[in-house]
A protein has these predicted regions:
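Conserved N-terminal/central alpha/beta ligand/cofactor-binding core
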Residues: 42, 48-49, 54-138, 142, ...
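Bacterial Sec-dependent signal peptides at the C-terminal "C-region" and cleavage site
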Residues: 14-24
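N-terminal Rossmann-fold NAD(P) dinucleotide-binding loop
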Residues: 36
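Conserved beta-strand-loop-beta-strand element in the redox core of flavoprotein oxidoreductases
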Residues: 140-158
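Beta1/beta-strand and adjacent pyrophosphate-binding region of the FAD-binding site
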Residues: 23-33
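Terminal recognition/anchoring or ligand-binding modules at protein termini
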Residues: 497-619
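Flavin (FAD/FMN)-binding glycine-rich loop and adjacent Rossmann-like elements that form
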Residues: 20, 152-163, 167-469, 599, ...
Length: 619
């Protein structure tokens, strides 16, 4: 009897220890969101053993699981893994033009197609494991990293990891790890932004339970059961209607509204802000039960809108697509969250740094680019008076600094998706799919470099991360002068983040741009300032307004001597001219900015030679 008791105790202990030990990995990504899948893929590609935990059945987050399958921005900047994803869409649908089915975007697709693409991309990485239907519960810091508890189909599992990446939709992991964060509108006196509010409050952007509808044919009647408490007046001004009496709103006709998110294969993404299915609620700090109750209301709003389209507008042939989501209600797995917690990071990116990037130094640390405007959805908020102090204006395209990924006080943790360290205002443009995908890719690089070289996250330098990004199709600066496969693209990117020559940002309606101005001559005054920032004791000698080809040669030779770099002679420079793909060598003509960047990058390698810290200051 005594032996049986001892045996039972031993077996119980062994079982308990087995349950506690769980899978071990180098990088653990929590959330298979747009940023999470990119982080996991990139980390694995760099040789780090990586696991992604995803609560639902699909990877891709807002691009797939939330049904926002119309890409916002970055059409001319298909960076990194986002670019790979877009290329896969092109391969599936036949051409880039085949993706331009609606007017809200040039890239629209069926969410299920996007989910299959991401699943296939992840499956190709031998160092990556994806575990679906796994919900995060808690995280505990250990001496060597993190211990994470998650629920997998009703069973608790424990994961151990060196580095943790929070790629959840609402920053739940960051909170569990003790990261300080902000929620909602900021006082302009605190954020330093003229566009911000006049006080701090927890008002966030509206969320949306998007719908993917399908045209079932002219004879079909897909009308759903009338939702409880249905009120058609809520939707009168969603499109032109005799019932719309609002003198301020100028709604489009229904056909225009439907073509907004038209997808391939006679499907429609319904994500309509103008008295459509945007819904205001702030569930960020709620428990699971509270969140479920609020999201049920958001679903109800969308279904009421669907019933309005079917019953009031005569579109009975449109119904929820039965070949998209494997959910009981045919709605997406998750809503489209436009705003989440925003961590207090080692840097805080605000709109001033977008409007006037060269007044600051953070642009030198760029790891993602975007061209979408500052777009806040607040139409569904019930008390519009509280929002009157917010103002929004045009912005150029921009890059996002690396420091937004790193919490100020917690180590061995990277935060991605929409919970990065940006202001409330800036979240309106960094929240979009291409940007968060790039942020995730950078997070994966940062994590992998740290674990593979046994370093702390903050010991990984900005330039190391940027170098890997460039090697993997990424952008550091939002220049659109050259496509990323052009042989001079990387040189312009490297010279750009060094600040030797500066780009010009423009805001043209919603098509925000930044140009390196590659064909323009090099201004002596601008160049002198750019060199002084990096080589403060070097004295540049040049005459006239613009630098000539011969003066460029002389400058490179002089800087080579100053920096004690051997092998930089006028003869070498002339020989390299053709080898580097440059043409029309004439010593007395003005050198173009592209030519100068290519030569300077090749001979003096400032990107490699001059490191910058997380704030963009030379070290």
């Amino acid at each position: 009897m005594k032996n049986r008791i001892i045996l039972s105790v031993v077996l119980a202990a062994l079982f308990f220890c087995s349950a506690c030990s769980g899978p071990k990995t180098e990088v653990l990504v929590i959330g298979g969101s747009a940023s999470g899948v990119a982080a996991g893929i990139q980390s694995a590609r760099l040789g780090a053993k990586t696991i992604i935990l995803e609560e639902h059945l699909w990877l891709g987050g807002m691009l797939t699981s939330a049904g926002v399958s119309a890409v916002d921005g970055n059409y001319r900047m298909p960076a990194g893994i986002f670019g790979e994803f877009r290329d896969s869409l092109v391969a599936h649908y036949g051409s880039l033009g085949a993706l331009a089915t609606g007017w809200v975007s040039n890239v629209l697709f069926e969410p299920s197609v996007g989910a299959r693409i991401y699943k296939n991309m992840a499956a190709r990485e031998p160092n990556l494991t994806v575990q679906y239907e796994t919900k995060f519960i808690s995280a505990e810091k250990t001496a060597t990293g993190w211990k994470v508890v998650a629920d997998h189909n009703g069973k608790q599992e424990v994961f151990e990891a060196d580095i943790l990446i929070d790629a959840t939709e609402l920053g739940d992991v960051a909170k569990a790890c003790g990261v300080k964060y902000d929620i909602g509108i900021e006082d302009r006196n605190i954020s330093g932004e003229a566009w911000a509010g006049d006080k701090n409050c927890d008002i966030i952007q509206d969320l949306t339970y998007a719908m993917i509808l399908k045209d079932y044919g002219p004879e079909a009647d897909m009308t759903i059961e009338r939702p409880e408490n249905y009120d058609p007046s809520l939707f009168y001004c969603s499109c032109k209607s005799q019932n719309c009496t609002d003198s301020v709103l100028k709604p489009w006709d229904f056909d225009m509204v439907m073509r907004y998110g038209k997808l391939p294969n006679n499907k429609y993404m319904i994500n309509w802000p103008m008295q459509g299915n945007d819904y205001y609620t702030n569930i960020i700090e709620m428990d699971e039960k509270g969140r479920e109750a609020e999201l049920k209301k958001a679903k109800h709003r969308s279904l009421c809108y669907l019933y309005y389209m079917q019953h009031e507008l005569g579109s009975k042939n449109l119904g929820l697509a039965d070949d998209e989501y494997p959910t009981e209600d045919l709605l997406p797995f998750i809503p489209y969250h436009r705003e989440s917690r925003r961590i207090q990071g080692v840097v805080r990116f605000n709109v001033n740094q977008i409007l006037r990037p060269y007044d600051y130094t953070l642009y030198r640390t760029g790891i993602a680019v975007g061209d979408y405007p500052v777009d806040h959805h607040h139409q569904a908020y019930p008390n519009q008076e509280e929002l009157k102090s917010l103002t929004f204006g045009p912005v150029p395209s921009y890059n996002v600094p690396m420091g937004v990924l790193l919490p100020k006080e917690v180590t061995d943790l990277i935060v991605a998706e929409k919970s990065v360290s940006v202001s409330n205002i800036v979240n309106g443009c960094t929240r979009l799919q291409p940007v968060v995908t790039q942020l995730g890719q950078a997070a994966g690089i940062l994590a992998a470099l740290a674990v593979k070289e046994n370093r702390e996250l903050r010991e990984v330098t900005v330039r190391e991360v940027q170098k890997v990004l460039l090697e993997n199709g990424g952008y550091l600066m939002p220049y659109i002068d050259l496509p990323k496969d052009h042989p001079h693209f990387k040189a312009l990117q490297r010279i750009g983040v060094c600040g030797i020559l500066k780009g010009e940002g423009r805001s043209i309606n919603w098509a925000n741009e930044t140009w390196f101005r590659k064909d323009e001559p090099v201004g002596v005054s601008e160049l002198s300032q750019g060199l002084a920032d990096l080589y403060p004791t070097f004295k540049m000698e040049a005459s006239g307004e613009y630098l000539s080809v011969e003066e460029t040669e002389n400058l490179l030779v002089a800087l080579g001597v100053f920096l004690e770099k051997e092998g930089i002679t006028a003869e070498h420079i002339r020989k390299a001219w053709g080898d580097l793909g440059l043409r029309d060598y004439k010593p007395n003509r003005p050198v173009s900015r592209e030519e100068f960047a290519v030569l300077f990058d090749h001979f003096l390698t400032p990107f490699d030679m001059i490191r910058v810290d997380i704030n963009g200051m030379p070290v």
